Amino acid sequence: MTSLAVIVPSRGRPQNIKDLIESFENTKATCDLWVVCDEDDPTLDQYKALNLDHLLIYERTQKGMARPLNLAAREIFALGKYKYFGFLGDDHRPRSMYWDIDWTIVLDQGVGLVYGNDLLQGENLPTAVAMHGTIVQELDGMVPDHLLHLYLDNFWKTLGLDIGALTYLPETIIEHMHPLAGKAQVDQGYVDVNAPEVYDADKIVFDKYINSDAYRELVRRLM
């Protein structure tokens, strides 16, 4: 039985999930893949046609991945089945064999976060990440409430550094097939979450939370 659940929010990109499944198979991943979709996604039937082992569907109330990621993390955590929780975008592609084992080996050492090399941000930002279940429990999710999309990786890096438990694995490749890397076309999903108003809103929420008593208490409990 795997100890790692990897959550992948996705909208309008069923082909990406198909490609991601192939990447999991090619790298001999044994973690459980949980795909999260919006109930109003016009391509929802195509996701269902993939016959995924784990598909969660939620009402969409805002743009971005933060809300569906947190809803899924809470629901999956409540199952009591997993020790560790990961996030991949639907535009990430694991390339290293047994990459998920690399993650769990680190997390077996204690409460913390781990990420690999996405060949775009590298060590700079954990665009794909895994964390100990204790973090999910204490945070009641994987990111602070009210974030939308763009500052999720900033939060993970900040939290990992502040609790002294952030591990970067440069040889564990989880390629980010992003337009900024010239590896994908800009679609409506990218347009929506990279809009200036989303960036501005996320920065305000991020800065406020990182400087809050709630965040300082979170760090204290995790150390």
Regions found by a protein language model. Give the residues of each.
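Short beta-strand/loop segment that forms part of the nucleotide-sugar
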Residues: 8-9, 30-41, 57-59
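A short, glycine-/small-residue-rich helix N-cap motif at loop->alpha-helix starts
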Residues: 60-69, 73, 122, 148-150
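C-terminal catalytic/acceptor-binding lobe
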Residues: 154-223
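Short, acidic, metal-binding catalytic loop of nucleotide-sugar glycosyltransferases
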Residues: 19-31
